[in-house]
Amino acid sequence: MKKLIVLTLTLLAAQLNAQIKQEKLQSLTQQTPQPQLLPVTYTEGGQNLNGFAAIPAKAKKNSPGILILPAWMGINNHSKEVATKLAKMGFHAFIADIYGEGKIPATTKEAGEQAGYYKSNPEKYQKRIAAALEALIKSGADADNIVVIGYCFGGTGALEAARAGFNVKGVVSFHGGLGKDANRKNGEIKPKVLVLHGADDSFVPQKEIDGFMKEMKDGKADWQMVYFSGAVHAFTEKEAGNDNSKGAAYNEKADKRSWAYFTDFLKETFGGKEMALKSKKN
């Protein structure tokens, strides 16, 4: 009988302990709300643009902001994942729509044509970036604490933000194009610059890299360029597949390493003003 009572009490204690753990887990989940990813319509040059604002769950007034310039196919799952990740870290993030409402490319051919237009008309690209920066600030970001990042075509845009002299503290290019028209003069580059580049990226010829380095030196920029071995173009984009022979492919090691360099850059650029940054990518 005594054994039965002891066994019953043990089972009751185990059930009670499990219930307490479950209640604690539910409480923790409720106390850690997820950031919001909200569609935002803004305009530039009479064109409606449909971006996304990622708002931290516990948003602080005038938190640092990060503008995300997507790759040539426009806003995709990858850019949304990055925005959400940054919002979890406490940043206000905004994904720019460069092409505009009704102009989302359906094929790589269309994407190449649209991206090519903005590369050939950098002043128009810069205006679209400026409009997105304004939308980021309106979403709650500190106008004096902003970093612009971009992927592929967007990486080119991040450098254009630096060339335009926008009020941003830093720019980061993930596997982006580095060149500009030879007729454009090299000017002062005020923001910090970080270029994260695949060592085997055939889309960016050495001549373009040399020109970029000269531009940075002529502009007296505070710049860094990091090469990742075995990585080709689009190394952060899982949708690119894993076949390096195609010239664009995902590389998990380069993806994780580039994210670590990026978060270190944020810590340095924002001077530790905000959040405990996490270098581990989800």
Tell where the protein language model's regions lie, with residue ranges.
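Short beta-strand/loop motif that positions the catalytic acidic residue
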Residues: 195-197
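Acidic catalytic loop of the alpha/beta-hydrolase fold
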Residues: 200-204, 233
